[in-house]
Amino acid sequence: MKRVLIAGTGPDPHHIYSGCVLALEALGLEAVQSMEAEDLEGCSGLILPGGVPDVDPARYGEPLAGSLDVTPELDEQYFSVLARAVEQNLPVLGICRGCQVINVYFGGSLIQDLETADIHRFDPKKEVVHDTACIPGTFAYDLYGAHAPVNTKHHQAVRRLAPEFGIAQLWFDDSIPRETQTELIAQAQAGTLTEGAHRCVIEGICHRTRPIFGLQWHPELLVDKPVEGTVNPMAVFRHFASLL
């Protein structure tokens, strides 16, 4: 049985880890939860899950400007685990904060506080859902086609895309005209769109040569509690498993 390390320890009040475990076990994979890079020994892949705090903006050369509960010590653990996985060329899936960690690790930056955060932010009373456009030629398009309605729980997102990455999914604010959306999708497909924005949020990224990809949304939370109208979350985990 192949093993996958899920980076993290401690309580799991929002079922971030348990959702990943459920998905992995459903695919016949063993989940190991740890923040120690050494525990990647014997593992076939790594999942960087979501959660708080925000990544320290000093890691991408910016002052604090909207990031919350920054904890450099925790960042160091996450980046250390990711570095070991990259060194071993292991498949990596980053979810929400994990997607942001991947982007920053490879040289990208983040929008520290989205102007459209109310559309994306966590709501304890209900599951917030919005549509995304999947970029042709990426894993997201292969899994879901042109559009993927997803859940959302974040106030930050990728700004400057890491150099070795492509965009897999985008969210557009309703204020962006349809023809402009089409142009931005074409730019993302061509690799010429390299920055996210408050009204054009990068929701998925993928490395051009390594088995590494990230999602700004939360497929793991949809595994145990599906939300009507959203995508099948297991497609993401099956894709990850196919890379192991």
Outline where the language-model segments fall:
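Cytosolic ligand/metal-binding cores
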Residues: 100
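Active-site-proximal beta-strand elements of phosphoester/diester hydrolases
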Residues: 213-216
